[in-house]
Amino acid sequence: AVFKFRERDPKVIPRQVRGNAILELAWTLIPAVILTFIAFPTVAAIFRTQAVPVKDALRVKVVGHQWWWEFQYPDLGITTASDLHLPAGRPVTLEIASTDVIHSFWVPQLGGKRDAIPGSVTRITLTADTPGEYYGQCAEFCGTSHANMRHLAVVQTPEAFAAWAAVQKEPALAPPDGSPAAAGLQVYRTSTCVGCHTVRGVSGGGIGPDLTHLGSRKTIAGGILRNTPENLARWVRHAPAVKPGSLMPEQQLSDPEVTALVAYLQSLR
């Protein structure tokens, strides 16, 4: 290009290109027609997902926090976090909000994304047909650990969902006397955990996730870790090392105390 279009005799006028009307019309009109045909079903689908669902739809309040998702089932009296349980084949209306900054709720395999906006509620209606696990990710940059703000959508058969819901409605069971979990309960009660977390019947903190049935969840730490004793111990010891910016402070607990606390939290099923 440098050689071909180098400066030459200024008296010689180069060939003038006036354009090609047929070509220009073609590359303008053909995409316009295609986009028009795509727009009709797309807009219709958008309005369908925002419409009021049938009366037997399950309501779930989805609340974004830095950097985890809270799920409330107001008609069932259930509050949980990280794992969103849904019954297969039943319409679900997600009412999405935020307590701090703008987030965006998204499960790619189940539907479109919706912003979670402080002081506002957005909605999306979906029906998950196939039982399974579907990963979700916050789709709006929301701070230091935006990439670590995940969750798991667990789609269950109606019978399995009903069984899960029945357990979730109950308060936490007291661990047997003399068990490692009982020792962990004492650690929980005397640590900073009670100031931020709720375990129904034990503590009523409202800053962090509800832990009443933590042991039954598949994920912890805002969806980034599988719920295993090893991962839970890592999280309890120093959450900011796992998720930068986490509000949960480093716990000044001995190894035996961590082991006991993990045993208690894992027993909350």
Question: In which residue ranges do the predicted regions lie?
Answer:
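Short, solvent-exposed mixed-charge patches
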Residues: 268-269
